[in-house]
Amino acid sequence: KNEWKIKLLNLKMKRTNVQLRMPHDSLFVKAQITDAEVIGGLFDLLRKSYSVRQLDWKEGAVKYDRPFETAKRGFDYNHLQLSQIAIGVDSFSYNPEKLNLKIIYCTLQDKSGLKIQRAGGSFAMDSMQMQLPNFFLETPYSKLKARMTMDLNAFNERNPGKLNLALNASIAKPDLIAYLGPANSAAIVLLNSFYA
């Protein structure tokens, strides 16, 4: 048994690079942390319970790559290159029964050109339900606010659970083009007719 408990008072990171390659997998993740600080961490390895009171990641970049997946134009979740990252977490906790996360600010830019100027909100998930009570996201062109509660069995064929979503969004053409990619000509023609 691993009965270690690690208490972290304050951790500051500057000009730090982290690389991760999964064994028996082609997945590659690289994080560049120019300036970050973690306050109030508690890690119970026996109970697999982890919490952080505050995280301020002021500048950095992340590369996430699955090299054997075909690359596509636009936003490509198999080949992410995120830059200008700044993330503020007010609280984070995880154990096998529940996950809680509160993001107070988030900015980043993807290689596709998609740029998030502001994002944040709370997120909670347990073995039964996922909750997103106050999510918001803004780009230079678009805005989105959402509230969602979803039972994890919401899409079961038999006795499905509930999904409640309240969405208020204004999505602009430049963001859709950045997400879909300029090579997606059929979608661009449809967008041009929609916005005309």
Name what the model sees in each region.
Residues 1-21, 31-46, 55-196:
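Extended amphipathic, helix-rich lipid-handling scaffolds
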Residues 23-26:
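Exposed regions on extracellular, virion, or secretory-pathway luminal proteins
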